[in-house]
Amino acid sequence: MVTLNHYLILSSLLFMIGLVGVMRRKNLLMLFFSTEIMLNAVNVGLVAAGKYMNDMAGQMFSFFIIAVAASEVAVGLGLLILWYKKNGSLDLDNLQLMKG
């Protein structure tokens, strides 16, 4: 049987994978994807905790996070596309060019 510990271990592993991706990648798109992995890891933890506590709050918070992540995807990908069209690269080191 799958217990709460299994879900929390999965959630923490996913979060660590996303955190390593955020710290090690220089491509803005990969940073964006790593952030999404971290948000989904939090969702797994919230849903699992809500299931084992017989409380719907975890699922409700998870739906709220999904809604926020969807708007983040819409705005973030739009900005990344514009950045790529302007500079031809999504390298994080080129972000210094935005200084006034």
UniProtKB/Swiss-Prot annotation:
Keywords: Cell inner membrane, Cell membrane, Membrane, NAD, Quinone, Translocase, Transmembrane, Transmembrane helix, Transport, Ubiquinone. InterPro entries: NADH_UbQ_OxRdtase_chain4L/K, NUOK/Mnh_C1-like. The chain crosses the membrane at residues 2-22, 28-48, 63-83. GO terms for molecular function: NADH:ubiquinone reductase (non-electrogenic) activity; quinone binding. One of its GO terms (biological process) is ATP synthesis coupled electron transport. It is found in: Cell inner membrane. Belongs to the complex I subunit 4L family. This is NADH-quinone oxidoreductase subunit K. The gene is nuoK.
